[in-house]
UniProtKB/Swiss-Prot annotation:
Residues 57-76, 98-124 have a biased composition (Basic and acidic residues). GO terms for cellular component: membrane. This is Uncharacterized protein UU044. It is found in: Membrane. Residues 57-171 are annotated as: Disordered. It comes from Ureaplasma parvum serovar 3 (strain ATCC 700970). It is a single-pass membrane protein. To U.parvum UU046.
Length: 782
C-alpha cells in the first residue's frame, strides 16, 4: 500500500515538472520570436466582404487569411501643385553659330556659360517685337484666333473690400486645332464688357468700343494619341535643329582634350544652351536607351574615354536617336489637356527621355496677345494688313505698310503751295490686293517740322486743302521740338480737319513736350500714332488723357524696344506713357466747390485708370492683367501725375483714385511720381491742401522699386513750404506734411506760416520743424 502511494506521488511530481517545463519553454520561445508582435490578432466573423477590391493595400504585415479585413490602404501622395502655364515669351534671336577659327584663339577671358533661366512675365519689362507668325484659325472656330496673354505680369491682387461682380461663365464645346490635329475642347467664351452709364454720359468711352481679349479660354481638351504624337514631333524637330548638328559635328573634329576649352570660349553661350536641354538625360543611365544602335554598341567603351563633360555631351548628342523622344512628361501632358503645347524653343528632355518645357504655347487661335495685335492691325489701322507684326523702325519712319504700295505724288500738290526743299512730301498709298468694303488707297502728307520753310507753311497748307475739299487720309509730322523744345504746334494741330483717319506725330528725342496734343480734344481721329526716335520709356513722357477722348485707337503695335538694337541708334518706336499730365483749361476756376473744379481732371483720370484701361496705351509700363476687359484693377496703369501746367493744384486733395462705378475694381490706383507747379523757393499750400493731401494714402511707400518722389516744375529751386491759413493742422495734415518732406528731396525742414498763426507755428515746432513767419513785409524768424 505504501508502495502504491509512493509511486503515485512520483508520477504526480514528474507530470507537474513536465508541465511547468513546457510552459517555461513555450514562453521563452514566444518572447524571443521576431514575429511575435504580428502573430497575434483578433478577427471577428461578420457579414463584410472577404476581399478589398483595391490595388493600394499594405501587405508588409499581412497574415495568412481568407479575408482582407485587417489590411490597411497605402496613403496616396499629395499631388504637387501645378504651376500656372506661362505664355510663350517671344523667342530671342538665335545667336549666330560661332566660327571655329574665332574660338580657338580667344582674346577675351572665357566666361562660364550661364544656365538658361526658366521663362516666366513678365515682366515687367516691355515686350519685344514678336517673331513667330500667326496662323489662321480653323473654320469650325467660333471666335477669332488667340490664346492667353504673356506677362501677366505679376499684378498685385486687389484688397478684399466689396465683393467682385460675378462675370457670366459661358462655355461651349467645339472642335479646335492643336499642332495640326483637330480635337474636341471645351471653351469659355468671353462675356461682353460692361460700360458704366456715367462713362457714356461724360464721353469717357472709346467712340469705337475696344476689346482687348476677344478669344475664348480653353478649359479642357480631349487629348488623343494623335495629338500626343504631333506634339512630340513638333519638339523633336527643334531638338534636332540643323545648326545643333552642324556645330556639334564640327566640335567633335577637335581633339577630345581641346573640346572643353573651345566650349568655354563660346561667348554666345550657344553650346551651353544645347547642353542644358539634354543634361538631365545625359547624366542619367537611361541615356543608353535613346542612342542609335551604333551608339549603344560604342557607349560602354566610350564612357571611360570621355575627358570632359563637354566631350561626353557632344558625343552623346551626335549618337542620339531623336525619333525616340515621343513621350510627354506628366507636366506636359497636364498642360496639353488645357490647350497648352510645350514651346519648342524652351523644351528640354528629362532624365526619363520625356519631353518637358519651361514655357507652354497656347493653342492656335487662342493667344490673346497676338490676336489682339492682329485685330488691331486689320481693323484699327487705317492702312490695315493681316498680320500681328508691328512695323519695323525703318517702315515706321518711311510710312510703309505690308501689302501697300507707296508712290511719291508731291508734284501734284505744287498748286496748293508745296514746293521742293520745304520738307513737305505727299505720298499715295495703294493696297496691292483690293479688299471690298475697306480703304484701298489714300493720300498721306509728311511734314518735317525741323525745316523752317515747311513749318511756317504747314498751317496754311492744311487750311487750303480743307477749303478745296481735297481728301487727305493722313498727316505725319516729323522732328517735333528738334530745333526748339518750345516749338508751337497747337495752332497747327487745331487747323487739322475735325474728322481725320490718320495722324502720326514724331517727337524729338530731346523734347518731351506733348502739351500741344490738347488741340486734338474735339477732333475725331481713327488712328493716332505718337512716336520718337529716342528713349521711349522715360518717365518724362506724359500725355493729357482729355486730349484723346475722341481717338478710336492710339497705336500700340509699332513697339520697337529691344536690347538687340545697337546702343545709341535712332530707332523709331511708339512712346510708352507712364505719366498723365493736365492743362490749366482742365481746371474749372469758376466752380464753387472742389469737386466741380476738378471734374474734368477726375474724368480724365477715370478714363485712363478704369474706363479705357483695357487699351494698351493706357496701361503704363507693365501691360494687361489676366482679364483686361472685366477686371481692370488687375491691369497696369500710368503711375505718374504731372500738374506743372495746372498752378491751382497744390496736393492730391479732391482727386479720385478709386473706381466709383464698379465695385469689383476694389483697389485704388497709387502713384510713384507727382510733379507740381512752382516758380519760387517757397511752395505755398493751404491748410485744406495739407489736411486732405492724400500723400500717405495715394503714394506708393515701402514697396520694391525706386522710391516714390514729389518734384516741382522749377526743379531743386523749391526748398520751403508755406502754409497759408489761421488754423492748426489736423493729424492727417501733420502726417501728409511728413510724407511730403519724405518724398520731396529738394525740401529742407523749414516751414513758413502767417505771423498771426502762433498755434500752428508751435504745433510745427513741436513736431520738429524749423518755423519762419511771414508778413507783407517778408520773412521774420520766430
Amino acid at each position: 500500500m505504501k508502495f502504491i502511494k509512493r509511486k503515485t506521488k512520483l508520477l504526480t511530481i514528474t507530470i507537474g515538472a513536465v508541465a511547468v517545463s513546457s510552459i517555461l519553454l513555450g514562453g521563452i520561445f514566444y518572447g524571443t520570436s521576431q514575429k511575435s508582435p504580428s502573430s497575434f490578432g483578433i478577427a471577428s466573423i461578420d457579414q463584410k466582404e472577404n476581399f478589398i477590391n483595391k490595388d493600394n493595400l499594405d501587405y508588409q504585415k499581412a497574415r495568412p487569411s481568407i479575408k482582407d479585413s485587417n489590411l490597411k490602404e497605402i496613403p496616396k501622395p499629395k499631388p504637387q501643385p501645378k504651376p500656372k502655364p506661362q505664355p510663350t515669351p517671344f523667342p530671342d534671336p538665335i545667336p549666330t553659330p560661332p566660327k571655329k577659327e574665332e574660338l580657338k584663339k580667344p582674346d577675351i577671358k572665357p566666361e562660364e556659360p550661364k544656365k538658361p533661366e526658366i521663362k516666366p512675365e513678365p515682366k515687367p519689362e516691355p515686350i519685344p517685337q514678336p517673331a513667330p507668325p500667326i496662323e489662321t484659325k480653323p473654320k469650325e472656330e467660333l471666335l477669332p484666333p488667340n490664346p492667353p496673354p504673356p506677362k501677366e505680369e505679376p499684378k498685385p491682387e486687389p484688397n478684399p473690400q466689396p465683393q467682385p461682380q460675378q462675370v457670366p461663365n459661358n462655355s461651349n464645346s467645339r472642335i479646335i486645332e492643336i499642332n495640326g490635329v483637330r480635337v474636341e475642347a471645351e471653351v469659355e467664351v468671353p462675356p461682353p464688357r460692361d460700360i458704366a452709364e456715367y462713362d457714356k454720359q461724360n464721353n469717357l468711352v472709346n467712340p469705337n468700343p475696344y476689346i482687348n481679349d476677344s478669344v475664348g479660354k480653353i478649359k479642357n481638351v480631349k487629348v488623343t494619341d494623335e495629338l500626343r504624337k504631333a506634339t512630340g514631333k513638333l519638339v523633336q524637330g527643334n531638338l534636332g535643329r540643323w545648326d545643333y548638328k552642324h556645330l556639334i559635328n564640327d566640335l567633335l573634329t577637335l581633339k577630345p582634350e581641346e573640346i572643353e576649352k573651345y566650349v568655354k570660349n563660346d561667348k554666345s553661350g550657344y553650346y551651353a544652351k544645347v547642353w542644358y536641354r539634354f543634361s538631365r538625360l545625359f547624366e542619367s543611365e537611361n541615356v543608353v536607351n535613346f542612342l542609335t544602335e551604333q551608339g549603344k554598341k560604342e557607349y560602354p567603351e566610350m564612357k571611360s574615354k570621355f575627358v570632359s563633360k563637354d566631350h561626353k555631351y557632344a558625343w552623346l548628342y551626335q549618337h542620339l536617336d531623336l525619333t525616340k523622344f515621343t513621350q510627354l512628361s506628366n507636366e506636359s501632358e497636364s498642360y496639353l489637356k488645357e490647350g497648352y503645347t510645350p514651346d519648342p524653343d524652351n523644351a528640354y528632355v528629362d532624365e526619363n527621355g520625356k519631353i518637358s518645357s519651361h514655357a507652354y504655347s497656347p493653342a492656335k487661335g487662342y493667344n490673346s496677345v497676338t490676336s489682339r495685335m492682329e485685330n488691331d492691325n486689320w481693323n484699327r489701322r487705317v492702312f490695315g494688313y493681316k498680320s500681328w507684326y508691328g512695323r519695323t523702325p525703318g517702315n515706321l519712319v518711311e510710312g510703309n505698310y505690308p501689302g501697300w504700295k507707296k508712290t511719291n505724288v508731291t508734284q501734284e500738290f505744287h498748286q496748293y503751295g508745296v514746293s521742293d526743299g520745304d520738307g513737305i512730301t505727299v505720298n499715295k498709298l495703294t493696297r496691292e490686293k483690293t479688299e471690298d468694303g475697306r480703304l484701298n488707297e489714300g493720300y498721306v502728307i509728311d511734314i518735317d517740322a525741323d525745316n523752317p520753310q515747311g513749318y511756317e507753311k504747314t498751317k496754311k497748307l492744311i487750311q487750303t486743302l480743307k477749303e478745296k475739299n481735297i481728301n487727305i487720309t493722313g498727316y505725319r509730322i516729323h522732328n517735333m521740338g528738334k530745333s526748339d523744345s518750345s516749338q508751337k504746334f497747337v495752332d497747327i494741330l487745331k487747323t487739322l480737319p475735325n474728322q481725320l483717319p490718320l495722324l502720326e506725330l514724331f517727337f524729338s528725342a530731346g523734347s518731351h513736350n506733348t502739351s500741344s496734343l490738347i488741340a486734338l480734344k474735339d477732333k475725331k481721329i481713327k488712328e493716332l500714332g505718337l512716336f520718337t526716335l529716342g528713349n521711349s520709356l522715360l518717365d518724362e513722357w506724359s500725355i493729357n488723357p482729355n486730349a484723346l477722348r475722341n481717338v478710336e485707337w492710339i497705336n500700340s503695335n509699332d513697339y520697337n524696344v529691344s536690347f538687340n538694337y545697337k546702343q545709341g541708334a535712332d530707332i523709331a518706336t511708339r512712346i510708352t506713357f507712364d505719366t498723365l499730365a493736365f492743362d490749366e483749361s482742365d481746371y474749372n476756376d469758376n466752380a464753387s466747390d472742389i469737386k466741380s473744379k476738378l471734374k474734368q481732371i477726375n474724368d480724365g483720370l477715370r478714363m485712363v485708370y478704369w474706363t479705357r484701361n483695357n487699351e494698351p496705351i493706357f496701361q503704363g509700363s507693365f501691360g494687361p492683367g489676366l482679364d483686361p476687359d472685366h477686371k481692370e484693377s488687375g491691369n497696369s496703369y500710368p503711375q505718374g501725375l504731372d500738374f506743372s501746367r495746372v498752378p491751382q493744384i497744390r496736393s492730391l486733395r479732391g482727386l479720385i483714385f478709386k473706381d466709383e462705378q464698379k465695385t469689383s475694381n476694389n483697389k485704388d490706383r497709387k502713384l510713384r511720381r507727382i510733379n507740381f507747379y512752382n516758380n519760387s523757393t517757397t511752395y505755398k499750400m493751404s491748410i485744406e491742401d495739407l489736411n486732405e493731401a492724400g500723400f500717405n494714402e495715394h503714394i506708393v511707400s515701402g514697396e520694391p522699386g525706386e522710391k516714390s518722389k514729389i518734384t516741382f516744375s522749377n526743379g531743386s529751386g523749391t526748398t520751403k513750404i508755406q502754409i497759408d491759413g489761421d488754423q492748426e493742422l489736423s493729424a492727417n495734415g501733420i502726417s501728409n506734411l511728413s510724407a511730403m518732406f519724405n518724398f520731396a528731396e529738394s525740401l529742407q525742414r523749414t516751414i513758413v506760416v502767417n505771423n498771426t498763426n502762433s498755434p500752428l507755428a508751435n504745433q510745427l515746432r513741436n513736431a520738429g520743424y524749423s518755423v519762419e513767419s511771414t508778413t507783407n513785409a517778408g520773412l521774420i524768424d520766430i
